[in-house]
């Protein structure tokens, strides 16, 4: 199964009136997410995905755009995505079936990637890592990394 790890796009700064949890995407952040999501949609070739997102506003907005572009079956908010504990995510979220996308924050995504496939990338804003994951063996292989700056995805024949 595919596990898609996605970081939110650029968010408004935290202020006295806007808490970290309430920070939404900027217009630029929305464009970043849409571009990355469209690249992912071409990669997935119309396979529907299930989306799980952290409860923060910027990740929920990111998940909404991802759902529009990538044939999402459903979006779930998951507090588990606010912690770097892959085993908890695996036990509460993962199941056989269609690909799933986990929309979260930079340090947690890096931790999940390192734990699942011993790979490390710096997650850019709206960056997406695609893991081919084997639930039985509890391990995966990083097979793709996309950013909003990528203009075209070379298709395999």
Go through each PLM region and give its residues.
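Active-site-proximal alpha-helix that buttresses catalytic centers in soluble enzyme cores
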Residues: 2-78, 109, 119-126, 157
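Short aromatic-enriched loop/helix-cap "lid" or pocket-rim segments at secondary-structure transitions
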Residues: 16-18, 89, 142-143, 154-157
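Glycine-rich phosphate-binding loop signature in dinucleotide/nucleotide-binding domains
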Residues: 43-46, 94-98
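Conserved beta-strand termini and adjacent loop/short-helix elements that scaffold enzyme active sites
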Residues: 78-80, 145
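Short alpha-helix plus adjacent loop in nuclease-associated cores
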Residues: 82-93
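Non-DNA-binding regulatory cores of transcription-related proteins
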Residues: 95-101, 106-126
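Domain-level recognition of soluble alpha/beta enzyme cores
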Residues: 117-143, 148-153
């Amino acid at each position: 199964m595919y596990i898609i790890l996605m970081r939110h796009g650029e968010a408004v700064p935290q202020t006295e009136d806007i808490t970290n949890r309430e920070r939404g995407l900027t217009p630029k952040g929305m464009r970043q997410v849409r571009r990355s999501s469209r690249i992912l949609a071409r990669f997935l070739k119309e396979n529907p995905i299930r989306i799980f997102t952290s409860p923060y506003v910027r990740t929920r907005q990111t998940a909404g755009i991802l759902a529009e572009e990538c044939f999402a079956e459903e979006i779930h908010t998951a507090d588990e995505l606010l912690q770097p504990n892959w085993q908890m995510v695996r036990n509460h979220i993962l199941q056989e079936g269609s690909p799933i996308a986990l929309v979260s924050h930079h340090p947690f995504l890096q931790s999940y990637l390192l734990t699942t496939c011993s790979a490390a990338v710096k997650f850019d804003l709206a960056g997406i890592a695609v893991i081919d994951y084997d639930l039985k063996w509890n391990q995966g292989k990083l097979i793709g990394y996309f950013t909003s700056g990528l203009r075209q995805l070379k298709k395999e024949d």
